[in-house]
Amino acid sequence: MTVITIAKRGLPKLTTSTSSTTTASSSSTITSVVSSSSSSSSLPLLSNSTSSSIIPSITPPSRNGNPYILDSGDMPNGTVFIIVGGIAGVIFLAILLWWVITTYSSHRLTRSVQDYESKMFSAQHTQFYGDSPYMDYPAKENFQDQVHISESDISPGNKDESVKDALVSHTNNEKPFLSNFERPLSSLVSESNRNSLFISPTGDILNKTRLSKLYQESPRLLQKPVIMTSDNVSTNSLVSTISSSSASSLDNGNEKEVGEDIRKPAKIASSPSRKLLNSPESDGSVNRNHSKGNLLVVQSKRKPTPSTYLEHMLEGKEQDE
């Protein structure tokens, strides 16, 4: 440890002398001032000390004969970083490839769905939906666009042949009959309880149950032959098939259920196909057919539900009591 002592230093004293001489006296004065100042001042003494430390050098063990030391003499520098970077790159490429495949498959699926919907909702398929322009056609086209036979146009000799031709055309045109059968029924789903802000949950449930019954009976009804009515008109429309099914079901004791299936949807929906059932001409023809036993339409004895009554009241319809 080095101790540094600091001594107090005094101020130099200046002495002046007056002389009448010239240069010699002035030089002696300067000499005396310098000598007096140097003699009276004392400077501190500084001592320097140095310290040194020994750092040992690390020497790795030799790889010769040591199985626990990897000999990396043949490997390049940064081998570990290269391996880690390669693994990360492979993972990134796998994720990118998965994203490309998923996007492509989703795009193809979307295109196929769009093509399917464009085909299903085209003009030739929209007749099965409630918002179809086919629903705005007159009821005559909905029910009487098939085979029409009248005795005024048929001679007595060709009457049997005309009936056979009508039966053959009825069998061949089974698919158009199915479209005409589904066309008025589709209005029950789209137009029922949708003409006002009031929605009847019970009415929707009843309509769905009636629709399911009618769709279940549709294959059996469409296989029936053409019925010749008393006014010499071939009634192979939906009214004749449903009415004939009601006539056959009366013999089996199902009068009440068939009557509800026929009359209740006609009161709910307001499409042209439903209005045909309530028209005076159809009522007159039904009464004539009822008198001869060809067509029977059973009036429903069940009173309308409160929700249906309110709906008709909001729509301004008169209730039949």
Swiss-Prot record:
Q: Indicate where the modification Phosphoserine is found in the sequence.
A: 132, 282, 285, 291
Which UniProt keywords are present, listed alphabetically?
Isopeptide bond, Membrane, Phosphoprotein, Transmembrane, Transmembrane helix, Ubl conjugation
Chief location: membrane
Sequence ranges of Basic and acidic residues compositional bias = 253-264, 312-321
Question: Which superkingdom does the taxonomy of this entry point to?
Answer: Eukaryota
User: Transmembrane segments in this chain: where?
Assistant: 81-101
**Cellular localisation:** Membrane
GO CC term, one of those recorded: membrane
Give the position of the cross-link Glycyl lysine isopeptide (Lys-Gly) (interchain with G-Cter in ubiquitin).
317
InterPro entries from the UniProt entry: PRM
Membrane topology, as annotated, equals: Single-pass membrane protein
Q: Where is the composition biased (Low complexity)?
A: 241-250
What spans are recorded as compositionally biased (Polar residues)?
279-288
Transcription: is it a keyword of this entry? no
Q: Quick one: where's region Disordered?
A: 35-59, 241-321
Family per similarity comment: Belongs to the PRM5 family.
Q: What is this protein called?
A: Pheromone-regulated membrane protein 5
Give the organism the record lists: Saccharomyces cerevisiae (strain YJM789)
